[in-house]
Amino acid sequence: RNHAVMSSYEPGSIFKPIVAAAAIDAGVARPNDTFFCENGKFKVGNAKVGEAVNHKFGWLTLQDIIVKSSNIGSIKIARQLGKRSYYDYIRKFGFGQKTGIGLPGEAGGQLKELSAWDPMSLASISFGQEIGVTPIQMTSAISAIANGGTLMVPRITRAILKDGQIEKRFEPKIARRVISIQSSRQVVDILKHVVKDGTGKNAAVKGYEVAGKTGTAQKYDPKTRSYSKTAYVSSFIGFAPADAAKVAILVMIDTPQGVHYGGSVAAPVFSNIVRETLRYLNVPSNDQLVYILDRA
């Protein structure tokens, strides 16, 4: 089974850059705008929402909401957007529909029609619950942020060769513009701080600037009809080099044993993959770029 295109997961906190990007692009919030995060407990309808590790955040900027991964802060950002605008951005980012990658069995994920949203939906989706995404959807969406706001149709190859000659070429294909270039740059800067100062420090790669987001999603247990307190999907999604991305990678670990936080489990794997991939692609490190500029 090709989980990258056939399996859907609740993404958890790796979905938070989507609400941040939407709010910034819609002009309803800026990275330095502050939101009160209710000291760790917030009532939404009949439900109570808390923070991971029982954090008790007070006032946080939008940037720090993403850097520190505040669930309540994400809800506050989503409320600034409103249901209709947030739903439209989620669709523009490619969720709830197939990416068109062309691989057999691709799933479209799960995104309820706006008319089916209940009072909790806006809040839940803001921090990556009540929505199902495929890994290729999530990677395509984060790539749109890295690409200056343009969503591309993913491809698995650039060309087909026969006897050393190009038989068929697959040109890059733009799906649509999702957010502006300026908005994308602001979100990229936020995601760089996640790795520099926040939950994603273990994703850092020496010599390169990395941008990304951690996620620790509780798995839904259909037997109890509630979220498990012992089973998680731990993840890290990001790209590098941050300001001129060559690779975007999602690491998802289904039901890790022991430590389960994405920043501890998935981020180090991401770091190792990115380091070796950039080396394989001969992408110069920051030190090499400085040397080249000095020589010039």
Task: Outline where the language-model segments fall.
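A short acidic/glycine-rich loop-to-helix N-cap element
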Residues: 254-265
